[in-house]
Amino acid sequence: MTARLAPVWAAFLGATALVAGSTQSGLAADVIKFGISTPLSGPAAPWGIPHKNATELIFDEANAQGELDVNGKKYKLEIVAYDHKYVIAEGVATVNRLIAKDGVKFLSILGGAVVKANEETVNENGVLNLPLAYAEGLVSPKNPLTFHSFPAPPETTTFWKWIKEHHPEIKSVATIAPNDDTGWWSIKIETNFVQGLGYQVAAKEFFERSVTDFNPVLLRILAQKPDIISVNASPAGSVGLIIKQARELGFKGRFIHIGQVDTSVVANISGKANVEGMWVHGYVQNPLPEQVKSWQARYTEKYGEWNATSIDFANPAFAFVAAVKKAQSLDPKKIAEALHTVEFDNLWGKAHFGGKDYYGIANQIIYSMPFSEVKDGVATLVAQLTPPYN
């Protein structure tokens, strides 16, 4: 097949690759290459680094256990990872390179705006994509080979019911999010949901990802006197600055991120006390189930320091390995068929792909989602909730 690729050559030539194992292009007789396009530098690196590392660790462990058996033949799993810096042009360039130069047929892309920019390329080249991304229309019948591997706002907004039950004093919500596909859709879903629960939406603001001075936006938000500020879809670097500057302007309320954010990174920027009481999805430091403690030890041994974001960002690799085993094929379409039926273990328990009633296709990962509250500087698990559909 001739790859159809977008012509973003300046970014293409500037892309930096990290390759685990063999550097041969294409699929060697005994190698399955898995492409990763993710931010390994910049404000979103606290997402991208554990995304790459978690995938690499799971593949290394599968290889050490005898590699992946497909119809009696052993295959070694390898990753080819590129840094897109959460810049759309870089994201397009890295995916182009993975498909055309590296010959990968299996991908995991992080970032809604980046995934949306690559939809056509992924679909036309018949590539299986297991992204970590928020964007409207991403999980859709028009993207049959895209299996979203992290809970999205239609799933995670259910935590607002928990808040309403446990903290009835909170009445008004303000939101601040990136000015792109990821931010627009995330806030649209979240604000519609909270309004349905009776909350007042005091303000909705968007920012460019390069912004570091949030005071003008925050002054508009704080003038509306919200009880809580949602920073959904915002990366840790931006969230730290938002919280720091909001506190300096006198905001005393809570913050919430029902996407995913590393609160330790946020606290290093904003100050530990300023993050106290924040609620987050998908980032837990304590208490950890036994299987997560084991993962923590293995991850720390390999990479030198622990990163709790890796817990949920391991999902694409878990899903891929389970589906290949079930499909007994390296055909992306057959692996996709297997993903519709296979139940697999992730670090929080059992997971599968579902959500057909909501999305029109069963391509959204479903599992018991962890939510935490920062208490004494530690992201402490307060609830595990199931999505509103199966």
Language-model-derived ranges and their functions:
Residues 243-315, 325, 379-389:
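Extracellular/periplasmic periplasmic-binding protein-like sensory domains
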Residues 101-204, 254-276:
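Extracytoplasmic ligand/sensor domains, especially the bilobed periplasmic-binding protein
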Residues 15-26:
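C-terminal segment of classical bacterial N-terminal signal peptides
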Residues 35-58, 82-88, 111, 176-184, ...:
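Extracytoplasmic "Venus flytrap"
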Residues 31, 46-53, 65-140, 149, ...:
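Beta-alpha junction/loop-to-helix N-cap segments that form part of ligand/metal-binding clefts
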Residues 301-310, 322-381:
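Segments of small-molecule ligand-sensing domains
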Residues 25-36, 69-78, 164-171:
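Immediate post-signal peptide segment of exported/extracytoplasmic ligand-binding proteins
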Residues 1-12:
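Bacterial N-terminal signal peptides that target proteins for export
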